[in-house]
Amino acid sequence: MLTPYAYHLVNVFAETYFGGNPLAVFPQADGLTDQQMQLIARQFNLSETVFVHQTTESSAVRKLRIFTPDYELPFAGHPTIGAAFVLHQQLNLPETYLLQTQAGLVKLFHEAKQICFGLQNHIDVEVIDDNLPQYTQLLGLSESDIAQIAWINTGSRQLLIQLTSLNALKTCQIHPALFQQIVKQSALYLWFVEQNQANVRLFFGSNGAVVEDPGTGSAAANLGGLCLKNGLTPLNWRIYQGDEIQRPNRLTLQVDESETIYVGGKVIAVGCGELFVPSGEGEPSQGCR
């Protein structure tokens, strides 16, 4: 037996129709098992696929489960914003509400031209100040290209490396073996900022390869957390990501006096459909109805 599940395709952090970070949203995913959600994420083979369930928190409108093709994430920015875009239309939600993630509750804000999430979580910071040659080899750069190295977690733990020039950001070459050794199942976020514009790149591992992500909200939140710890707030930055892989993403990052981190961007709907999920693994498909 095949059960149809509706999905929506959206581009998050997009300012052009084929820009942004693509996302599949399943707005009614109750009934899917963890294994089925993982297999569906692998089928779509996007950086993440998000599944919406009834919430277990009375203050939240829905619960999100976020999967890469290889594993589940406790939190990720572009799936949260993309799911919010779909749910806001389907459920006629107010301009501000809460969504539940595996990392906790996230507050969403719908503004005139974009959707933002706000975090006020505990920020874990581990600054790396030794073994610099290992990181220069990881990036294929020199020591003078690196300004700061730190592990940050505002919802998803990632390695952030600040670079000293835009050229270093554009020309770095990631060493796959060292990436697997140092970053493992986390992500590497490289950033350079000048005059309130941050240019960034994010890399993650998938099936033994190093893949570049076009737009990453959780890493932008971690960047805000690092700036908060470094005393660089309040701030209002525009983030450029994805240009090196011809998939331009544009994000906003704000940190206010209350130490709340806001990450936002525009969302463009590009498609929808149904996926037929078998009740038993290996059941033959009966095709479209």
Curated annotation (Swiss-Prot):
One Pfam family of this chain: PhzC-PhzF
Entry EC no(s): 5.1.-.-
Active site: 48
GO molecular function terms listed in the Swiss-Prot or TrEMBL record: isomerase activity
Keywords recorded for this protein, A-Z: Isomerase
CC per GO annotation: cytoplasm
Biological process per Gene Ontology, one example term: biosynthetic process
Top-level division of the source organism's lineage: Bacteria
Gene3D superfamilies linked to this entry: Diaminopimelate Epimerase, Chain A, domain 1
NCBIfam families associated with the record: PhzF_family
Family: Belongs to the PhzF family.
Name of the protein this chain belongs to: Uncharacterized isomerase PM1503
Organism: Pasteurella multocida (strain Pm70)
